[in-house]
């Protein structure tokens, strides 16, 4: 069948004509087209087809062996089709070369090679070694042409810049050095490949059925019937005398024969395949086909009647016979099953009759006991048979190993025997030569040394042959590895380009959806609370948008990375709000974050990961500072945070210190334990690790906070420490590491008294923030002062928990990356548009949740708003601390004076005085 398809490869309507570039040396190169340009000038003018006869190993049972097949290549699909002869109308099957690799073994039979695809391994054999190498090189070339034919990804430039000339020449020189280890181009074997091979007689087998494909029997019958009809039509036209053969064309003329719609599935019913449409131009060739003994079933063809009606009747009868045969088999199987059921019923009936025939209960009980004993005996027998089966299986395994060893031994003996036969042949030739050419001197008998020398020389000849075979195999495998690697790189580039394109389109889709939701929100605000038809429609659209899940969009496989419910650290990507407006805002924010992540993945995150991977050991440096400001990838963040924490608490750490603090809590309860227990359930209610009942994070957080309470009795526990420790736990995952991270933040990074009872340093930082905002954002502060907005109501908690409750997780952790290394050192226009203090407070409360571009935030913080020199921060803190302490001291004095005045006045109601109520009562 492949043969038919091979000729069909010449048709422009089915398989396009395959081209075989051949060098002046007469063979194609194994190298890709761009590497074989040096041979381009000597290529033949006319392209050659890749087709010819090869032996394919296959079959089952007694007919398993080598079968002659006609192979031809389809350039459109990069498939290698094969049929029984070159004249068959439809191929038997095809081999997908786009994902295949080729192999030839030095110890295999001459001309044998393999095509390995992901689904199977096809073993083929050529007539000679030269033909095998030609096929392998041509298949490599065709595979490379198929992979290199599509245009390169847009990211790759079409031409190298002029400045890259030396680099390009160096790469070409390196490639030329690599090509020295490859096979040289093989000349085209005359008459064995190409269109001329179709004119050669088909290789025959001793048995007629040995060359038939039983796996594709329907296709074989279809090809046979087509050949018979074609032969009759050719004979009916009366071209020339019957005994005269028409002239043969240079190529089989079958350009008008269509191929099946899907050659990869040749096992379809013949009725489903397209019918051949012979033309008058094919008459001469069809007459020639009739002369050749290439029919699949010669005896079957002779027995057919002359009329088409008889053929159809025979086919119908054959199908009816097959149907009746299947029905007979099913009836026999049904009879067998019914027979077994009848036997079981009879046995049950006999047992029941015996049971009912018993006169007394004792007899019946004895029958039951007898059956129980039989069941027990049968169970023991089954166990014994099972043990026997296992022992037999072990014995069979040992026998199999012995058989394999004996087979290897027999193979060694056969090889030795072959070597001895070769020695005998050489010695016989030498004896014949000695008899025909008698020596002038008497022959000297061979000694032991001479015999050893001859045997060594013979071994050397064999080793040279083996070495040459392995050298050829090695060169071919080098070229195969080289080409497969280049194909893999090209496919990887294409895949990367497609993934980038998909991510870009998905990001654009998220942006469009976000704009749609934002538009709905603006329409809702414009509609107000009016109960109109349009407002009802807006409400329905909003509910549908909020209920829409990303999983529905990815059901058809279009969306590659849908918005998940939780992020990588367990935080909700879309927070749950009770108010519908806030739900809509949360959905818009989730879409914007997802869109930004997709757009920044290839352009920002991948280069950043590469820089972190190449960083090596961590050490304080400007480069590390820049990398921390750019953000730490998730896979590197635990290692980096541990190093940053250790850098700050190295002088405080000691082996077993954390366990010692935990043991103190087991001896007696800390006064802050009750408050810690109350705050555990309020820690990050939007994180699944702290809300799931089976999670271990709450227990870890409890132990970390209790240990810190014992570590720093001055502070003990303060609200807000639970969030700091929770962030450390989510990233570091280890209790002790999270504990030392909390110690580093409270005792080394933050100023003293930041978490004390008076929160002195926290209040100082609020005043420092006011000064910095007056310096950096004077318009904003003037606007806030106009409406008497106090930022400390919001920013106080931001600073106390280092934005743990304010920012989304991916931006929060980037802030912490820089915070742990550098210590304590957006939306202005939106705030300036607000003209009401209540609106400003509401906006400031939620605007941190709307920040989705971490890169923009870091740029504003470290570039636009810079500098924030630590010297200036210390001076501002010192000045405000002095003022705050003076104010607190003044308040303490006023409090003391007030208490002193109150104590000097005595009780509020002196003894002997009556109230107005009492006086009225007496009157």
From Swiss-Prot:
This is TBC1 domain family member 2A. GO terms for molecular function: GTPase activator activity; small GTPase binding. The lineage of its organism: Eukaryota, Metazoa, Chordata, Craniata, Vertebrata. Residues 914-923 have a biased composition (Acidic residues). Residues 301-439 are annotated as: Interaction with RAC1. It holds the Pfam family PH. The modification N-acetylmethionine is found at residue 1. It comes from the Eukaryota. InterPro entries: PH-like_dom_sf, PH_domain, Rab-GAP-TBC_dom, Rab-GAP_TBC_sf, Rab_GAP_TBC_domain. It comes from Ailuropoda melanoleuca (Giant panda). Acts as a GTPase-activating protein for RAB7A. Signal effector acting as a linker between RAC1 and RAB7A, leading to RAB7A inactivation and subsequent inhibition of cadherin degradation and reduced cell-cell adhesion. The modification Phosphoserine is found at residue 915. The gene is TBC1D2. It is found in: Cytoplasm; Cytoplasmic vesicle; Cell junction. Residues 631-823 form the Rab-GAP TBC domain. One of its GO terms (biological process) is positive regulation of GTPase activity. Transmembrane segments: none annotated. Residues 47-144 form the PH domain. Interacts with activated RAC1 and CDH1. Residues 1-171 are annotated as: Interaction with CADH1.
